[in-house]
C-alpha cells in the first residue's frame, strides 16, 4: 500500500512541477504576479524534479537561471539515486487472495509465502529482513521458485558465497514445509547434479527439492497437490527431457511426469520459474501457478504493472508482477518481482518483494 501511495505521490508532484513552470512562464509574459522561486525549487526538491525540468525545457523557462539550470537536474539525479537505493535495500510484502471451490474446507485460509530470484543472500541485513517478514506471515507452506543461486557469482566464488543462503533455507524449513524448484541460474548446479554441495546443503537444511515432482499435502483426511517444475532451459542435461527441442514441449513433458498419479480433482498448486508459459500450464488441471524470473521488468512506472524488459519476454513484457489469468480462464498465476538482481543489478520503482498468498474456498 505504501508503495502505491508513494507512486501516486511521485506522479502528482511531477505534474505539479510541470504545471507550475508553465504557469509561471505565462505570468512572466503577462507581467503579472509571479510564483516565488523558492516554491518552484521546493516542488522540485520534494520529488517533482522531472516534471520541473520537463517544464523548463518545453516552456523555455528558467533555463538561464543558474539555480534552476544546475539545481533542478541535480535534484532529479538525487531522487533517482534515492529511489534506486530503496529498491535495492528495502523489501516489501505483497499479499494476494486466491479463491477456489476445489479447495477443501479444512484448507480454507491456507497461506503460501513465495520467495523468488534471491540470487544468493548478499548481506546479513537482507537475511534478517527476509526472515522477519516471512515469520510475520505465519505461512503453512513456503515456495522457493528458482534462482536461489546466481550463476556468475557462484562460478567466481566456486560456490563459497552461499553460506547465508543455506542458513536461510534452514530457518525457512523450520517455519513451514519449504519446497524449492530450479530456475535458469541453477544450471550451474548441474555439472554434478546429485553431489553438488549447494544442493546437498539445502536439502540437509530441510528444504525439499521438487523438480518434476509432486507432493500431496494432507490435513484431516483431505488433500491438496503441490507440483514443481524446473526451468526448461536446463533440461538439456536431463536424459529423458533433453529430447524435446523447445520450452513448450519440455514443460508439457514435465507436467505429464509430475502430475501423473495425482488426483487432479484436488486443488493443484504448481511452482514454475517461467511466467511466459502460463497458457501451457493452463492446458493441464492446474489451479494456481507461482512464478518469477521477470524481476518485475527491472524498470517500472510509479504505478501500474508495466515493466521495461524481462528475460524470454523482451521489451515491455506481459508477465512481470502480480496476478494473471490464462486465456482459457482456468488457471491463475502470481508472478513475484523477486528479491535479488543478476545481470542487470539495478531496479527502478521495482522494490524486491516477498509474496504472501492466502487461498480461500
Predicted regions and their residues:
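Beta-strand-turn-beta hairpins that frame and shape the catalytic cleft
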Residues: 99-113, 207-208, 214-228, 263-264, ...
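Binuclear metal-dependent hydrolase catalytic cores centered on His/Asp/Glu-rich metal-binding motifs
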Residues: 196, 200, 204-207, 219-268, ...
Amino acid at each position: 500500500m505504501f508503495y502505491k501511495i508513494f507512486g501516486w505521490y511521485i506522479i502528482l508532484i511531477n505534474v505539479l512541477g510541470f504545471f507550475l513552470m508553465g504557469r509561471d512562464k505565462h505570468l512572466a509574459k503577462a507581467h503579472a504576479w509571479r510564483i516565488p522561486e523558492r516554491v518552484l525549487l521546493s516542488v522540485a526538491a520534494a520529488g517533482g524534479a522531472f516534471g520541473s525540468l520537463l517544464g523548463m525545457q518545453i516552456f523555455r523557462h528558467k533555463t538561464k537561471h543558474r539555480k534552476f539550470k544546475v539545481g533542478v537536474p541535480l535534484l532529479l539525479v538525487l531522487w533517482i539515486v534515492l529511489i534506486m537505493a530503496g529498491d535495492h535495500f528495502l523489501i516489501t510484502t505483497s499479499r494476494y487472495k486466491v479463491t477456489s471451490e476445489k479447495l477443501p474446507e479444512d484448507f480454507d485460509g491456507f497461506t503460501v509465502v513465495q520467495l523468488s530470484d534471491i540470487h544468493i543472500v548478499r548481506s546479513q541485513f537482507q537475511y534478517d529482513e527476509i526472515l522477519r517478514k516471512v515469520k510475520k506471515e505465519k505461512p503453512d507452506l513456503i515456495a522457493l521458485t528458482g534462482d536461489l543461486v546466481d550463476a556468475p557469482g557462484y562460478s567466481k566464488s566456486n560456490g563459497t558465497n552461499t553460506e547465508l543462503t543455506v542458513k536461510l533455507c534452514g530457518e525457512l524449513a523450520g517455519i513451514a514445509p519449504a519446497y524449492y524448484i530450479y530456475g535458469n541460474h541453477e544450471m550451474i548446479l548441474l555439472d554434478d547434479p546429485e553431489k553438488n554441495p549447494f544442493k546437498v546443503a539445502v536439502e540437509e537444511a530441510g528444504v525439499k527439492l521438487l523438480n518434476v515432482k509432486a507432493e500431496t499435502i494432507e490435513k484431516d483426511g483431505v488433500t491438496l497437490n503441490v507440483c514443481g517444475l524446473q526451468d526448461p532451459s536446463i533440461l538439456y542435461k536431463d536424459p529423458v527431457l533433453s529430447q524435446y527441442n523447445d520450452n513448450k514441449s519440455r514443460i508439457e513433458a514435465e507436467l505429464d511426469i509430475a502430475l501423473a498419479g495425482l488426483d487432479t480433482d484436488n486443488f493443484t498448486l504448481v511452482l514454475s520459474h517461467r511466467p511466459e508459459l502460463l497458457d501451457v500450464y493452463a492446458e493441464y488441471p492446474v489451479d494456481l501457478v507461482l512464478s518469477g524470473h521477470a524481476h518485475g521488468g527491472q524498470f517500472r512506472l510509479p504505478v501500474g504493472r508495466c515493466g521495461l524488459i524481462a528475460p524470454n519476454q523482451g521489451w515491455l513484457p506481459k508477465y512481470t508482477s502480480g496476478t494473471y489469468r490464462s486465456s482459457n480462464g482456468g488457471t491463475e498465476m502470481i508472478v513475484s518481482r523477486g528479491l535479488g538482481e543478476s545481470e542487470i543489478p539495478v531496479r527502478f520503482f521495482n522494490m524486491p518483494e516477498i509474496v504472501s498468498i492466502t487461498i480461500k474456498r
